[in-house]
UniProtKB/Swiss-Prot annotation:
Compartments (UniProt record): Cytoplasm
Enzyme Commission (EC) number: 2.1.1.199
Name of the protein in its database record: Ribosomal RNA small subunit methyltransferase H
Domain of life assignment: Bacteria
Purpose: Specifically methylates the N4 position of cytidine in position 1402 (C1402) of 16S rRNA.
Reactions the enzyme catalyzes: cytidine(1402) in 16S rRNA + S-adenosyl-L-methionine = N(4)-methylcytidine(1402) in 16S rRNA + S-adenosyl-L-homocysteine + H(+)
Main EC class the enzyme belongs to: transferase
Alphabetical GO biological process terms: rRNA base methylation
Length: 306
């Protein structure tokens, strides 16, 4: 495994997913293969992995060499995967909704404000880039995106300064955007860089990350076997809210009845999930010390019962 990639909450994911021999699992976000590799290593099972990032292919080939026919890969976004999975159903599904270390640490991908590179941020290297967005969107749209997806209270000031700067020169690098944001906000106490929220917001918007998550969850029932488990690790409060509400809306509860009734408790047939993690799981302090990028991770899991 790449030395720079540390799968977030790996032990918790494996404990909740509970892989078993001869079962099949779906890794919706291959990244550098951390979850896929760990699941395959845990028992004699099979894993299908998804990712739309063309840069993962080298790691995909490594895992294929290690596990042979037990591992398969489909180059696709998880929200677009249903037709390509050819009616397969899985005993467990895992999703890591964060940007991988591999994406953050390559300056040319344009995800990170720590390295100077082209202002891109696209997961699939196709479609509208962050550079196009900050150089063409109007002030109100930029402000709304930064506020909605980054929860940045100074979004209007940042947007105003982006408009001012781009009248002088095109904003075409991560360094330029980060400097504009830092200038707009000024110094903030703490270890988190002032540009963090703005970069996160633009990345989420550019890749339609929340919409893709909602689209996948709306259809996930069709590819999960009965008693199959869905495990989701999110890194943003809006992502976590979507997952939490989805689990809540689809979780089965006993139908109310008289305490004197002798018939068995019935389950609402429109509800098909049983929540496994009644309280959200978060990384241990030890993991955060080893991998600061894990600090905002939240894990939720549920089981299909119908």
């Amino acid at each position: 495994m790449s030395q720079y990639h540390i799968p977030v909450m790996l032990s918790e994911v494996l404990e909740v997913l509970a892989p078993k021999g001869y079962e099949s699992y779906l890794d919706c976000t291959f990244g550098a293969g951390g979850y896929s590799n760990a699941i395959l290593k845990s028992c004699y099972c099979s894993v299908t992995s998804l990712d739309c990032d063309p840069h993962v292919i080298e790691r995909v080939e490594q895992i294929k060499q290690d596990y042979g026919e037990r591992f398969s890969f489909i180059k696709t976004n998880f929200a677009d995967s249903f037709g390509k999975l050819k009616q397969q159903k899985f005993d467990g599904i895992v999703m890591d909704l964060g940007v991988s270390s591999m994406q953050l640490d390559i300056a040319g991908r344009g995800f990170s404000f720590l390295y100077d590179g082209p202002l891109d941020m696209r997961m699939s290297a196709q479609g509208f880039s962050a550079e196009e967005f900050v150089n063409t969107a109007d002030e109100e749209e930029i402000s709304d995106v930064i506020y909605k997806y980054g929860n940045e209270s100074l979004s209007r000031r940042i947007a105003k300064n982006i408009i001012k700067y781009r009248k002088i020169a095109r904003i075409d690098s991560t360094r330029k955007l980060a400097e504009i944001v830092r200038y707009s906000i000024g110094f903030r106490k703490g270890k988190i860089d002032s540009a963090t929220k703005t970069f996160q917001a633009i990345r989420i918007y550019i890749n339609n990350e929340l919409g893709e998550l909602e689209r996948f969850l709306a259809n996930v029932k069709n590819i999960l076997k009965k008693n199959g488990r869905l495990v989701v690790v999110s890194f943003h409060s809006l992502e976590d809210r979507i997952v939490k509400n989805f689990f809540k809306e689809n979780s089965a509860k006993p139908v109310a009845r008289s305490k004197y009734a002798k018939d068995e408790i019935k389950i609402d047939q429109n509800k098909w999930l049983e929540i496994i993690t009644h309280k959200v799981l978060t990384p241990s302090s030890q993991e955060i010390r080893l991998n600061v990028r894990a600090r905002s991770a939240k894990l939720r899991a549920a089981k299909k019962i119908l």
